[in-house]
Amino acid sequence: MTDILNKILTAKAQEVAAQKAAVNAEHIRALAAEAAPVRSFIGSIRGKHRLNLPAVIAEIKKASPSKGLIRPDFRPAEIARAYENAGAACLSVLTDEPYFQGSPEYLKQAREAVSLPVLRKDFIIDEYQVYQARAWGADAVLLIAAALEQEQLERFEAVAHELGMTVLLELHDESELEKCRNLTTPLWGVNNRNLRTFEVSLDQTLSLLPALEGKTVVTESGITGKADVEFMQSRGVHTFLIGETFMRADNIEAEVGKLF
């Protein structure tokens, strides 16, 4: 595990402890049970595939540790509507505050503005956060293999599925495959950003494709335009998580539209 990931996870453990003190586990489970009905995240992706279109998971991200502030003019509901109008399949919303300037309020605002399913993009280290995600209205959660042990991955996936949510499993390299062998989610993402160097290469996804046969593979990071989309589609990858390229655009709707 890298130094930056270690720092993030240490801070996250403190954050979750404080959240549990404010809203106990029993209460967060009750809130999750009362949340608005789940929208099918994987269903929306498959719907695009049936139309022979790339399925774009469009990200709402204000900042990142590597790039700092990405979009000063940050209006989550407006961004969500632009994504929906442009043909995105789903949304991904950052809820991590210390490193990504995210917020659960951004997720709620985005989901209320559109009919698309929404992923909570965060560092999930406790099943409490899975219930919390559903309570906030999320339809899917991200589980990062590099951040979790096998037992945690399996338990958190089971909780998410019990709540009707989709799990997006995120891999970085082949060394993480073994601990994920029992997971049943159909949605497997490959982050093209090297956790050690922060360099981005689409080869990360390509190198893992043989091991992910039969999965719906999501390529994450490094997709900058239609040429990248067409290249990955030629290799059998039809689902794309894209954030920074859209967030830096003056006209987000037009930028997304360029991919189709």
UniProtKB/Swiss-Prot annotation:
Q: Which PROSITE patterns match?
A: IGPS (PS00614)
Q: Please state the Enzyme Commission number of this protein.
A: 4.1.1.48
Which Gene3D superfamilies would you find in this protein's record?
Answer: Aldolase class I
| Metabolic or biological pathway, per its Swiss-Prot or TrEMBL entry | Amino-acid biosynthesis; L-tryptophan biosynthesis; L-tryptophan from chorismate: step 4/5
Q: Which InterPro entries match?
A: Aldolase_TIM, Indole-3-glycerol_P_synth, Indole-3-glycerol_P_synth_dom, Indole-3-GlycerolPSynthase_CS, RibuloseP-bd_barrel
Question: Domain of life here?
Answer: Bacteria
Q: Which reaction does it catalyse?
A: 1-(2-carboxyphenylamino)-1-deoxy-D-ribulose 5-phosphate + H(+) = (1S,2R)-1-C-(indol-3-yl)glycerol 3-phosphate + CO2 + H2O
What terms describe the molecular function in GO for this protein?
indole-3-glycerol-phosphate synthase activity; phosphoribosylanthranilate isomerase activity
Q: Which GO terms describe its biological process?
A: L-tryptophan biosynthetic process
Q: Which keywords accompany this UniProt record?
A: Amino-acid biosynthesis, Aromatic amino acid biosynthesis, Decarboxylase, Lyase, Tryptophan biosynthesis
One of the Pfam families matching this protein, by short name: IGPS
Write down the top EC class of this protein.
Answer: lyase
The UniProt entry's sequence similarity note says: Belongs to the TrpC family.
In Swiss-Prot or TrEMBL terms, this protein is called: Indole-3-glycerol phosphate synthase
